[in-house]
């Protein structure tokens, strides 16, 4: 997970809780702070540092940054008085999480001195992941409670798969839990399920839902990790993995609730259109697509990016997405 200063602290807390509340919880959570954060965001992170006191390096970093006002007493900063009652008082969802599993989760916080963008932050996070299988997530989304369980069960039966995602439920608003988000869902982003379908789909559109993907760390690293490719860092990664004969799959199940507040505006404008052309040209130069495959979809995507926001929003929600 990667967080930067413009994100909502309540969304961050809800996202982390949706990870820690999984029916099959993770062994570790790696949170990359992409540059300096606001005091409110640092306060949320401090809550989890307090809940996982073995992460003493982060506690020291917080103390050196002068963040003692975020609810850390001197004893809390030393990591030796993380009592159950105090945790429940600071974060009521903690008691429910402990009912789900007694497994101890390791919580890593990695701080970058400057904001370098999502790709750079995720590459740094990869270095600190000790597990071969990594579940990705954005810090303003909500994972379905059984997301990891479903993905791991599938992967146990399909050992050849290197990256697995699934359906995303898109919603608008300030929901802080899956049940509330479900009532605000306006569309579903589905992706093809089999390798054969994905091999055809990847030439035209992104075949993997990045916010809910689970992938092999070694496969991502062997493909070069995330590389500079504005707006398309994840798509570019899947293309390079595909060229390296990686095996992909997607589940039909809804694995994640994704906030799309303002998404359609971000996918428009001249700069975005230029990035579309550059990325599609890269695919053509790398012989992933032919010129006949390059031209029609590139023209369509450029035209969509130059549409008025309201028209582009209608197109995404009514034509390019599965309706509720």
Task: Cite the ranges covered by each PLM segment.
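Short, well-formed alpha-helical segments that are part of the catalytic scaffolds
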Residues: 7-21
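Glycine-rich, basic loop-to-helix element that forms the pyrophosphate-binding segment
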Residues: 111-129, 150
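Short aromatic/hydrophobic "clamp" motif used to bind/position activated sugar donors
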Residues: 134
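Conserved donor NDP-sugar-binding/catalytic core segment of glycosyltransferases
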Residues: 146-184
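Catalytic beta-strand/loop signature of glycosyltransferases that borders the donor
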Residues: 167, 248-255
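Acidic donor-binding loop at a coil-to-helix junction in glycosyltransferase catalytic cores
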Residues: 231-237
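Catalytic core of nucleotide-sugar-dependent glycosyltransferases
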Residues: 246, 258, 266-290
């Amino acid at each position: 997970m990667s967080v930067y200063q413009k994100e909502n602290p309540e969304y961050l807390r809800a996202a982390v809780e949706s990870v820690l509340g999984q029916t099959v919880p993770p062994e570790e959570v790696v949170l990359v702070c992409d540059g300096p954060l606001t005091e409110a965001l640092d306060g949320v992170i401090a809550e989890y540092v307090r809940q996982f006191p073995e992460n003493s390096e982060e506690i020291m970093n917080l103390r050196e940054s002068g963040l003692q006002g975020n609810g850390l007493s001197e004893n809390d900063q030393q990591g030796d008085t993380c009592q159950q009652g105090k945790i429940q008082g600071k974060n009521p969802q903690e008691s429910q999480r402990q009912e789900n599993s007694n497994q101890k989760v390791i919580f890593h916080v990695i701080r970058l001195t400057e904001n370098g963008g999502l790709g750079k932050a995720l590459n740094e996070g990869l270095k600190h992941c000790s597990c071969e299988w990594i579940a990705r997530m954005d810090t303003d989304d909500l994972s379905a409670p059984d997301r990891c369980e479903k993905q791991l069960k599938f992967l146990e039966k399909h050992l050849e798969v290197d990256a697995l995602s699934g359906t995303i439920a898109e919603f608008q608003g300030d929901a802080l839990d899956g049940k509330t988000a479900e009532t605000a869902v306006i569309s579903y982003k589905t992706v093809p399920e089999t390798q054969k379908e994905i091999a055809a789909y990847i030439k035209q559109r992104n075949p993997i839902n990045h916010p809910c993907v689970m992938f092999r760390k070694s496969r991502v690293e062997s493909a070069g990790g995330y590389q500079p490719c504005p707006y398309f860092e994840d798509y570019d990664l899947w293309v390079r993995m595909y060229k390296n004969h990686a095996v992909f799959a997607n589940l039909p199940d809804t694995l994640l609730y994704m906030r799309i507040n303002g998404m359609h505006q971000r996918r428009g404008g001249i700069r975005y259109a230029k990035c579309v052309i550059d990325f599609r040209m890269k695919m053509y130069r790398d012989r992933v697509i032919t010129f006949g495959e390059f031209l029609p979809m590139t023209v369509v995507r450029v035209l969509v990016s130059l549409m008025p926001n309201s028209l582009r929003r209608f197109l995404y929600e009514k034509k390019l997405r599965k309706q509720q």
